[in-house]
Design a protein with these regions (language model features):
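Tryptophan (W) side chains
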Residues: 12-13
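Eukaryote-biased recognition of intrinsically disordered, low-complexity regulatory segments
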Residues: 21-29
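Short, contiguous acidic and Ser/Thr-rich linear segments
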Residues: 31-39
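Conserved short loop/turn motifs at secondary-structure junctions
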Residues: 32, 55-60, 164-165, 197-206, ...
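A basic, amphipathic helix-loop patch mediating RNA/tRNA/ribosome contacts
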Residues: 41-75
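Fe-S ferredoxin-like electron-transfer domains
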Residues: 68-245, 249-251, 258-262
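Catalytic alpha/large subunits of respiratory electron-transfer oxidoreductases
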Residues: 113, 117, 229-485
């Protein structure tokens, strides 16, 4: 089913091999259920409410089977099997919590804790750490290792990203989300064995967007946020859901608040059109709320000077001035903002129409929306949704650097190509990240991009439908030409 949240690797596996209609019957912990042929055991279990623990497995990304926490017992198989790579089969009987499985997970945790520091009381991840939860659940309260722990010094990769190699369990989530999800490839693995650790591709520092996805996806406290470090514990904060206003995507974000101060932002419940995704602006761009330059109280002009006053006095003054203008038959113009929510703009236009009696309402916009709406008049073309980007067979990106102007759309488009093999075509002024996987990429300056489309007509005509994403550089008559094309 279409969803803005990335679908699992098991769904991609089924889709590519044409197994979507084939169902098999399996039994998991005594519960009989059906699943699409090719579905991974870990996903089939989740659908019936059975959670198989895993550190390296993450829905939507390539499989690793590195942590061995997802081992399950399968009838007629002599050894335990990793549930994150094992596809279901007809008649399969799976035990996810048998004594044999429990002992294996306890042993795995003992290995993971061999060099892991026991610094939960001072670790930022304490209270929401997946490793901590698993140790409480399965034990491993004692260690048979008497050797000195191998320890590596914490590294600051950037102002926002810190890495502690001693805490890292090498699940490779951060590498995969940066490479596969974002197409940046800023992280890699160096050394081997006990000396192995995650390393920036450019040596000792990150060269990326600093979106913080690697921090959020880390199951332990190996990657921490420079803006949140040592400020609070998860249980000490209240959480409020809101909508990011830095671009028109409208991503859901959850603000963590303590004593009236925003300490961090993420999308902890993975709701909204963006699922778990947030770009750098959505994750870290909230500091303006607490800026010292922000007005804390209304200002009114008295004797030529702006002075602080109360809300009551300020609103009374504004109401009186508005009334005087209306009595003189004056006209009003109201300017809204693209950085406020739909609800706030709704009340602004309601105030303008009912309170001021004017329909002169506008806002600043960078794109040529008026030309676009005029070009669509009487046409059959439909406006695409974010979900369409994940399901479309083909997409055209023209006149925009998608990863910078609309990061969520770039994220979804890349996921579609990774999971479904969709075709992407790009016509831009300079190199863009979509070039990495695009079927064809063309370079064209502003005003020349529509003409350059003729070179893609043959490729695009092969697809029954195409989702088109165009940027600010396509304006005026070019918008109408694009719709007609």
């Amino acid at each position: 089913e279409p969803s803005s949240r990335l679908r699992g690797r098991s769904r991609w596996w089924c889709y590519e091999r044409g197994f979507m209609a084939d169902l098999v019957t399996i039994t998991i912990d005594g519960k009989q259920t059906t699943a699409e042929k090719g579905t991974l055991v870990i996903e089939a279990a989740r659908k019936i409410g059975v959670e198989i623990p895993a550190f390296c497995y993450y829905e939507g990304y390539s499989l690793q089977a590195a942590c061995r926490m997802c081992l399950v017992e399968v009838e007629k198989m002599p050894k335990l099997q990793p549930g994150c790579t094992l596809p279901v089969a007809e008649g399969m009987v799976v035990l996810t919590d048998s004594p044999k499985v429990t002992e294996a997970r306890k042993t795995t945790l003992e290995f993971l804790l061999t060099n892991h520091p026991l610094d939960c009381p001072i670790c930022d991840k304490g209270g929401e750490c997946e490793l901590q939860d698993m140790v409480f659940r399965y034990g491993a309260g004692e260690s048979r290792f008497t050797e000195i722990k191998h320890h590596g010094d914490e590294k600051q990769w950037s102002p926002m990203v810190y890495y502690d190699p001693a805490r890292c369990i090498l699940c490779y989530r951060c590498i995969r989300v940066c490479d596969e999800g974002l197409g940046v490839g800023a992280l890699g693995l160096t050394y081997r064995g006990v000396h192995a650790e995650i390393t920036p591709s450019h040596g000792d520092h990150l060269e990326c967007d600093e979106c913080g996805m690697c921090i959020d996806i880390c199951p332990v406290g190996a990657l921490t946020s420079g803006s949140y470090r040592y400020k609070s514990r998860p249980w000490e904060m209240n959480h409020a859901g809101t909508v990011c206003t830095h671009c028109s995507n409208g991503c859901k974000t959850t603000l963590a608040i303590r004593n009236g101060e925003i300490l961090r932002a993420n999308n902890r419940d993975q709701s909204g059109i963006n699922g778990e995704f947030l770009c750098a602006k959505g994750r870290f761009g909230y500091d303006f709320v607490h800026s010292e330059e922000r007005l804390q109280s209304p200002l009114v002009r008295k004797d030529g000077q702006l002075v602080e006053t109360s809300w009551s006095e300020a609103l009374t003054l504004v109401a009186r001035k508005f009334a005087e203008v209306k009595q003189r038959g004056g006209k009003f113009g109201v300017i809204g903002s693209t950085r406020t929510t739909n609800e706030e703009n709704y009340y602004l236009q309601k105030f303008a129409r009912q309170g001021l009696g004017t329909g002169n309402i506008d806002h600043h916009r960078s794109g040529d929306v008026a030309s676009f709406l005029n070009a669509l008049a009487g046409k059959r073309e439909a406006l695409a949704s974010v979900e369409d980007l994940y399901t479309t067979k083909a997409a055209l990106v023209i006149g925009t650097e998608l990863s910078q102007q609309h990061p969520l759309l770039a994220f979804q488009l890349r996921a579609n190509h990774r999971h479904h093999g969709s075709s992407t075509y790009a016509v831009t002024r300079g190199p863009v990240r979509e070039d990495d996987y695009a079927a064809r990429s063309l370079r064209a300056g502003e005003g020349e991009q529509i003409e350059a489309l003729e070179q893609l007509r043959g490729d695009l005509s092969k697809h029954a439908s195409v989702v088109i994403l165009f940027g600010d550089s396509v304006k005026g008559a070019d918008v109408a030409k694009l719709v007609a094309f």
